[in-house]
Amino acid sequence: LEDVAQAHGSTWKGRYLGTFGDAGCFSTHERKLITTGEGGFILTDRQDIAAAARVLVRYGIENDVGGVKLGSNYKLGAIPAALGLSQLAKLDAKLTGRKRIGDQIRAALSGLGWLTEFEIEPSSVHNGYSLVYQVTDPKIEVWPMSEWLAKEGVVSDTWRYRYKPMYNMPLFQPYAKQCVNAERIIPRTITFPCHEGLSDEDIAFMVDRIAAAPKAGAS
């Protein structure tokens, strides 16, 4: 089961993410590259998984049989579905725009010695959902800095969603396993937007705020 909620259009070794496992689960939340406002879809080439998914989203009803299990009404309405299809037609243009803007932001941030971008595997294509960096200077407190940036309008997902290892969340604590690398990496991680709607002025403002953030966040 692939969690590819943010991976629309991304590839690895020439193959689309979401096609490696038995099923790929995508989100179509309003901030994703393909959006229906809310919702998502499952990508699978297994007939049994596709059939089970159709039953689940249609109240547990199987065609020609009727109710076979308890289900829910998870069907996407016609209007959001039409919106999603229109977004799909724009995906290639979005990927191109995000690459251009991402490269522009990377170049502008390259002089900040306290920031290091997570390496993108050479045989992969990154869709530009966001740029992900590590704050490598141990003297910089990442959380206050992220909070200050958010107030300035540059919001990191690690701050927005309060990232932490999942086993630190109440739901998963009974299954906790210590993941020392996650414990070390997450508190030093920060993300920056690079969507195709950013203008040159937006990028200049964002880079200026990021450059000022370590001192401003510490004050």
Segment roles from a protein language model:
Residues 19-56, 78-81:
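Active-site PLP attachment segment
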Residues 8, 17, 28, 34, ...:
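Short clusters of hydrophobic/aromatic residues that line enzyme substrate/ligand-binding pockets
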